[in-house]
């Protein structure tokens, strides 16, 4: 008796969505239903292979972003899986923070954050929080990933007393001078040097 060959009536995936860290991989399994399935097989395609490539259902995360993986049957059926690839903030580059001057208020420098040569956007790709930034000494800024970025990275910076300004010199005699200046917030002493 000759068997009637019919294409699969449907195809499903074991994952409707998938989140991967850049450089990682995972396998998506396809299952066909209905029909004989004797001549049906699944082919795979990525909407953006620079973000996520696929080979026989194995998805490899190539770059940060989103891509759609589609499984096609020879019978014309298809099903999709949305892949999100995330980058680690620990792999980002953060610009050095120069020494800051104490102001009596919170000192909050804004470092530039780049990932793979791309400048990230504050409050879209990451958020910042500060520690010990209201006093003279060492402070820190913590970068926390957001959206397509994950994890944290901390950078330290120094806060020093502001430079003395409005220095005035007046003579009080042949062997003495009087110095006056604007008070520096946070300074508890001043050093005066004499140069011959």
Where are these regions (language model features)?
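Glycine-centered loop/turn positions within well-structured domains
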Residues: 50, 67, 175, 188-190
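Extracellular low-complexity, O-glycosylation-prone stalks/linkers
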Residues: 184-196
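Extracytoplasmic soluble-region selector
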Residues: 1-91, 99-101, 105-138, 142-157
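N-terminal non-catalytic regions of secreted/periplasmic and cell-surface proteins
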Residues: 92-93, 177
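Pro/Thr/Ser/Gly-rich low-complexity, intrinsically disordered linker/stalk tracts
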Residues: 160-186
């Amino acid at each position: 008796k000759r068997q009637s060959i019919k294409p699969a009536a449907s195809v499903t995936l074991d994952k409707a969505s998938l989140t991967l860290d850049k450089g990682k991989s995972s396998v998506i399994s396809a299952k066909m239903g209905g029909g004989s399935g004797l001549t049906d097989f699944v082919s795979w395609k990525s909407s953006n292979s620079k973000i996520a490539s696929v080979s026989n259902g194995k998805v490899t995360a190539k770059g940060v972003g989103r891509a759609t993986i589609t499984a096609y049957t020879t019978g014309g059926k298809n099903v999709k899986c949305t892949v999100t690839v995330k980058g680690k903030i620990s792999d980002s580059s953060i610009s050095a923070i120069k020494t800051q001057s104490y102001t009596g208020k919170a000192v909050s420098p804004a470092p530039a954050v780049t990932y793979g040569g791309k400048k990230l956007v504050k409050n879209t790709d990451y958020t910042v929080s500060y520690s010990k930034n209201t006093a003279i000494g060492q402070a820190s800024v913590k970068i926390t990933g957001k959206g397509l970025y994950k994890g944290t990275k901390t950078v330290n910076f120094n806060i020093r007393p502001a430079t003395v300004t409005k220095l005035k010199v007046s003579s009080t005699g042949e062997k003495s001078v009087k110095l006056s200046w604007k008070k520096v917030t946070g300074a508890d002493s001043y050093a005066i040097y004499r140069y011959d």
